[in-house]
Amino acid sequence: MLSLLMTTEYAPAEDRHELQQLLLHIAGGDRDALAELYQRTRVAVYGLALSYLKNAHDAQDLMQDVYVQVWDCAEQYRPIGSPMGWLLTVCRNLCLMRLRREERHAALSEEEWNAIPAQECGLDADERALLQGALASLADEERRIVLLHAVTGMKHREIAALLELPLPTVLSKYHRALKKMRSFLEGDDA
């Protein structure tokens, strides 16, 4: 179970060059490139939005805002950085703006958790319930770091830059989170 969070098997590997090309085409007004970017990155964007907003409906709504923002601002992307990092920074900034506006931090309800399509994470209902419990045992920032690494396949250095945290902090929080999750899962299995 925990090994699922330590791989990127369920998230497509970031192909930096192809994503850069898509962003350049989007900057030129290519709607097909936007559709392709959406297909390649939607799981990662949704996962990040859900980790901030903790509400499936709000995360889906914000996800649409992200791609509208990408369409409007694609010409601002500079191909020196990670295209996925740029996209997730857009998502993060929109999440933070929404949270500031709404000032709410509700827990992910069981109904909202179940709204996540099963095929997106490759788990059956029992495994999803265990994973939900393990993730709920984490602090918000720990959960966000684990999900960014597991869902998007981002490297810890990229997560540190995205969350504006020192790399050693991200690494320690990630490893502490995995220990907490392992402890939670071993407690349930006993």
Q: Which residues make up each language-model segment?
A:
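Conserved RNAP core-binding helix
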Residues: 18, 39-42, 46, 56-73, ...
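Arg/Lys-rich amphipathic alpha helix in sigma70-family domain 2
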Residues: 72-79, 88-109
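DNA-recognition helix of helix-turn-helix
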Residues: 92, 96, 142, 151, ...
